[in-house]
A protein has these predicted regions:
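Single conserved hydrophobic/aromatic residue that forms the stacking wall/gate
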Residues: 1-6, 10-11
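Residue-level signal for inorganic ion chemistry
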Residues: 15, 57, 104, 133, ...
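Active-site loops of AMP-binding adenylate-forming
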Residues: 15-21, 28-46, 79-82, 160
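AMP-binding (ANL) adenylation modules
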Residues: 27, 41, 70-71, 100-101, ...
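Conserved ATP-binding/catalytic segment of the ANL
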Residues: 51-118
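Adenylate-forming
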Residues: 72, 105-134, 163-183, 202-204, ...
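Core catalytic subdomain of AMP-forming adenylate-forming
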Residues: 87-103, 119-144
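Conserved C-terminal "lid"/linker of ANL adenylate-forming enzymes
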Residues: 141-143, 150, 191-247
Length: 247
């Protein structure tokens, strides 16, 4: 069996190791589903494939992905202003995603609004770094910081049950998420995991981190309904931790 996926970046190697071929695709509601996709006879790992039949694709100067085809939606209901923000007069849909396109295969870099621009003018995709960090079984959440900063840092949320079991084997006493996160040995463990993730980043790497002292919670407004971290909310809520890294 083959599987076509089109959500957040998936961990392809995990599925492949189970003998399940994964073919990534790309699309959005305004695009009427799929714009690009890999197929069994034409696939390139790390990309979301090639444009579907009848679909035109190009990148704007800032790297934003633009698509045009007969299936692009006509506009938002009774909201002409919002429609003009995403569809130009030539019918190109501005997706809000930044990508890399070689004329054949498309690679998604990040959401345009999430791209970090460091004080040195370097554009950084936080989600790519965050996904590398979260491959660690000990780390549940990673929020990369660095917009208009001299270096990258991260806020880290632990995978409580796994870290707790690790701590028990090390005879590290703890009773709450907070005191487990604040334990020096746990923080050393997490730093080692971040260093492993840094090995996959050729240029900018995480230089400092701070531990979140509570689990992120949808009811507290930290997460979306689909359990994605709300970057701006978290950065505001934990601004003291962030500023401490840049003292």
């Amino acid at each position: 069996d083959n599987r076509l996926v089109g959500s957040e970046m998936c961990i392809r190697d995990s599925f492949m190791s189970l003998g399940v071929p994964i073919y990534e695709g790309y699309g959005m509601t305004e695009n009427s589903a799929i714009a690009t996709g890999n197929t069994p006879d034409k696939v390139k790992l790390g990309t979301v494939g090639t444009p579907q039949a009848g679909t035109e694709l190009k990148l704007a100067e800032d790297g934003e992905i633009l698509v045009r085809h007969p299936g692009v939606f006509k506009g938002y209901y009774k909201n002409e202003e919002a429609t003009k923000e995403v569809i130009d007069e030539d019918g190109w849909l501005y997706t809000g995603d930044v990508g890399e396109y070689d004329g054949e295969f498309l690679k998604i870099v990040d959401r345009k609004k999430d791209i970090i621009i460091t004080s040195g003018g370097k554009n950084v995709s936080p989600s790519e770094i965050e996904n590398n960090i979260k491959t660690s079984p000990f780390i549940k959440e990673a929020i990369v910081i660095g917009d208009d900063r001299k270096f990258l840092s991260a806020l880290i949320g632990i995978e409580y049950d796994i870290v707790s079991n690790w701590a028990l084997r090390k005879n590290i006493a703890h009773t709450t998420y907070r005191n487990l996160s604040e334990n020096e040995e746990v923080q050393n463990l997490i730093w080692d995991e971040i260093q492993k993730a840094n090995e996959y980043t050729s240029s900018l790497q995480i230089r400092k981190f701070r531990m979140l002292t509570k689990e992120l919670d949808h009811e507290d407004g930290d997460l979306t309904a689909t359990q994605k971290a709300k970057r701006n909310v978290i950065m505001e809520k934990f601004s003291d931790l962030i500023e401490d890294m840049y003292k």
